[in-house]
Amino acid sequence: MSELKDCPLQFHDFKSVDHLKVCPRYTAVLARSEDDGIGIEELDTLQLELETLLSSASRRLRVLEAETQILTDWQDKKGDRRFLKLGRDHELGAPPKHGKPKKQKLEGKTGHGPGPGPGRPKSKNVQPKIQEYEFTDDPIDVPRIPKNDAPNRFWASVEPYCADITSEEVRTLEELLKPPEDEAEHYKIPPLGKHYSQRWAQEDLLEEQKDGARAAAVADKKKGLIGPLTELDTKDVDALLKKSEAQHEQPEDGCPFGALTQRLLQALVEENIISPMEDSPIPDMSGKESGADGASTSPRNQNKPFSVPHTKSLESRIKEELIAQGLLESEDRPAEDSEDEVLAELRKRQAELKALSAHNRTKKHDLLRLAKEEVSRQELRQRVRMADNEVMDAFRKIMAARQKKRTPTKKEKDQAWKTLKERESILKLLDG
């Protein structure tokens, strides 16, 4: 009980910080969802509130460290007292040891040696006390308080967003405003190539020609005939390709007229809706003659290609006449193909890219303008800080003069007024 009464601890009552009253912005930010985020205008208030919380936490830590130090000092003082007590006991037990020879001399006449007996128990009693002191004198390991590095890491992460704008960042914005060299490449429309059916037909024909040449070469080797037939002539291949293209260009119905001529004739000729050609009954004829006549007049035979001269010139003349009358557009400005989905999607994305790049360029111009304005404001703020230092120097000089019980000189007063007016003028520029 006496140890508890002598305990020097103060047992401080730690008062917690009321977040709703002291830190309302911090409490509101914690109550938000993650998607809302934090605005730039809230950072200054948040900084003040977080510094308030940090100062409260550091104050509590200092009090706890002081209490821990008091406990350590108290334990050391208790150890010193025990050591002094043991020293006194040791000094009290020492005289019998020094008096042993005298007692032996006085009692030596009897020839008995019980003299040293009374001194032994004292030495035995002293030894355990020394061991006990050595046991209790072990240093107490005070646990180290872990360093709270969270505020430092927080302010280090926020620092890039609150730091002053440098000239390098302004140059970076100016470089971003320059149009890229390959910008025109993104708006080019590649030319339309051959249709896949034509390309595949040519590829199939080439493969067939190669396979045929390879098969002919193998057959000639088997027969032992090695001649000019084993190698495929490139001229023959080109001729076959041109022939296949000409056949491919010819419509399936075998009509020699062009597409424009056919469309014009279809617009001028009325369709027989009552009895179409396909539904008309075909008379049955027997015999060779009737078979020959039926074959010649059969609708199937009408689908066979027939030759009409000057079809290409007729097609071109009709096209020129329709263009001259204004019914067709000139080929110099090709009409858009509404069925080309790839081209429509490409132009749609190009329009979106143009709009987005224009929007980004506008925002970059605004950002560059704001950055230049902020740089000028930073210079004014630097001048304000310098003016503040000059005002504080003048104030210290005046206060030092008053402490020395002398009136400030006219020069000191004029200097103070001059610095104050300069500071006010800079503040007006900064606010304007």
From Swiss-Prot:
Residues recorded with modification Phosphoserine: 280, 298
UniProt keywords, alphabetically: Acetylation, Coiled coil, Isopeptide bond, Nucleus, Phosphoprotein, Transcription, Transcription regulation, Ubl conjugation
Location in or out of the cell: Nucleus
UniProt feature coiled coil, ranges: 40-69, 367-407
InterPro entries: Histone_AcTrfase_su3
Superkingdom per UniProt: Eukaryota
Cross-link (Glycyl lysine isopeptide (Lys-Gly) (interchain with G-Cter in SUMO2)): 21, 129
Region (Disordered): 87-127, 272-319
One GO cellular component term noted in the UniProt record for this chain: mitotic spindle
Broad class of the protein's primary localization: nucleus
GO molecular function, a single term: nuclear receptor binding
TM helices/strands, residue ranges: none
Task of the protein: Functions as a component of the PCAF complex. The PCAF complex is capable of efficiently acetylating histones in a nucleosomal context. The PCAF complex could be considered as the human version of the yeast SAGA complex. Also known as a coactivator for p53/TP53-dependent transcriptional activation. Component of the ATAC complex, a complex with histone acetyltransferase activity on histones H3 and H4.
UniProt protein name: Transcriptional adapter 3
